[in-house]
């Protein structure tokens, strides 16, 4: 087991190579199962802040790949059914309300507009964030089993009547820490069996 804390973001000026470098290091260390976590904004009222979502599909809204027609990718090389099953089992045993959905990747660093959120929803997006997809792609390309968990820390712009603040994001992340730790610990134990 190897745990890495934090990540580099492209909006911080990091190149794609720098962003995915930690995944390459993990693979070189012999890591076969990769659990990626992030904070994301919920695109659905039924997935309130504090919810944890298994990423079952992803949509690239950065347009950096030359594709101008974003589509959901649910390829199993990016999203392991085995690891998802373990996560769902752990959540049931521990009373953790685990959601499923599609993660929308944007570059940031500004929060999205309500018009962008409407577009993401029209393509079946469930959550939006400014990281993670490069790591998912690299892990999949390297043949790692992947599980991505999004901690939904806020409603995305226009979903709630309340204005979005970074303080809300940090507060909700802190409030959900115990559930996330319990879930991750259980998943790791499930993988080790």
Residues covered by each model-derived region:
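Non-catalytic positions within long, well-ordered alpha-helices that form the structural scaffold/packing
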Residues: 27-30, 121, 140
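General beta-strand structural signal in soluble alpha/beta enzymes
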Residues: 3-5, 34-38, 54, 98-104, ...
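Metabolite-binding pocket within alpha/beta catalytic cores that recognizes anionic/polar moieties
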Residues: 1-75
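Generic non-transmembrane alpha-helical segments
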Residues: 82, 86-96, 182-190
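Zn-dependent metallopeptidase/amidohydrolase metal-coordination segment
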Residues: 130-168
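His/Asp/Glu-rich mid-to-C-terminal helical/loop segments that flank catalytic regions of hydrolases
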Residues: 157-193
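Active-site/ligand-binding-proximal alpha/beta "capping" segment
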Residues: 89-126
């Amino acid at each position: 087991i190897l745990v890495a804390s934090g990540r580099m973001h492209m909006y911080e000026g990091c190149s794609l190579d720098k962003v995915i470098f930690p995944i390459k290091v993990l693979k070189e260390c012999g890591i076969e199962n990769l659990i990626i976590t992030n904070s994301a904004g919920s695109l659905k009222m039924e997935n309130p802040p504090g919810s944890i979502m298994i990423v079952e599909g992803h949509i690239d809204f950065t347009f950096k790949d030359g594709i101008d027609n974003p589509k959901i990718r649910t390829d199993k090389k990016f999203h392991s059914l085995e690891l998802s099953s373990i996560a769902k089992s752990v959540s049931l045993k521990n009373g953790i309300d685990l959601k499923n959905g599609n993660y929308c990747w944007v570059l940031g660093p500004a929060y999205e507009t309500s018009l962008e959120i409407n577009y993401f929803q029209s393509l079946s997006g469930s959550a939006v964030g400014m990281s993670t997809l490069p790591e998912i792609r690299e892990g999949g390309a390297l043949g790692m089993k992947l599980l991505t968990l999004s901690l939904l820390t806020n409603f995305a712009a226009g979903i709630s009547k309340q204005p979005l603040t970074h303080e809300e994001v940090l507060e909700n992340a802190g409030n959900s820490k115990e559930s996330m730790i319990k879930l991750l610990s259980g998943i790791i134990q499930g993988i080790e069996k």
